[in-house]
Amino acid sequence: MLSGQLVVRLFSMASRVCMSRGSAGSGVIGPVEAAIRTKLEQALNPEVLELRNESGGHAVPPGSETHFRVAVVSSRFEGLSPLQRHRLVHAALSEELAGPVHALAIQARTPAQWKENPQLDTSPACLGGSKKSRN
């Protein structure tokens, strides 16, 4: 029989995969997204890892994996500043950030912070790389 904590973790993992697949638009997790997920899980042992491929909302070819938003909840972030937390995420993803990933929005929180506000932020609409506002 599964323990309650394991069941919650399995349910959480399943919902993250569904969220990730639904947000990518194609229903398929690509190799870059899979690599990001694996590397963050290995480096930070997160309690929560929500990953959203936001490439479809930008001026890139269909199926691209260039723009991501991630929420990482880990006890490894305890006592660290936001900058130090982001550096840990960047270190884990150095290969992806040097290559295929153009933009990575990071929410790096402790378990207590996530408990207060357990949601992934939304990104603003893409302006196509220009700083002009849309009419």
Curated annotation (Swiss-Prot):
The modification Phosphoserine is found at S81. Residues 114-135 are annotated as: Disordered. It comes from the Eukaryota. GO terms for cellular component: mitochondrion. Disulfide bonds: none annotated. Keywords: Mitochondrion, Phosphoprotein. Gene3D superfamilies: BolA-like. It is found in: Mitochondrion. Pfam families: BolA (PF01722). Its main location: mitochondrion. InterPro entries: BolA, BolA-like_sf, BolA/IbaG_stress_morph_reg. Belongs to the BolA/IbaG family. Acts as a mitochondrial iron-sulfur (Fe-S) cluster assembly factor that facilitates (Fe-S) cluster insertion into a subset of mitochondrial proteins. Probably acts together with the monothiol glutaredoxin GLRX5. May protect cells against oxidative stress. Interacts with GLRX5. This is BolA-like protein 1. The lineage of its organism: Eukaryota, Metazoa, Chordata, Craniata, Vertebrata.
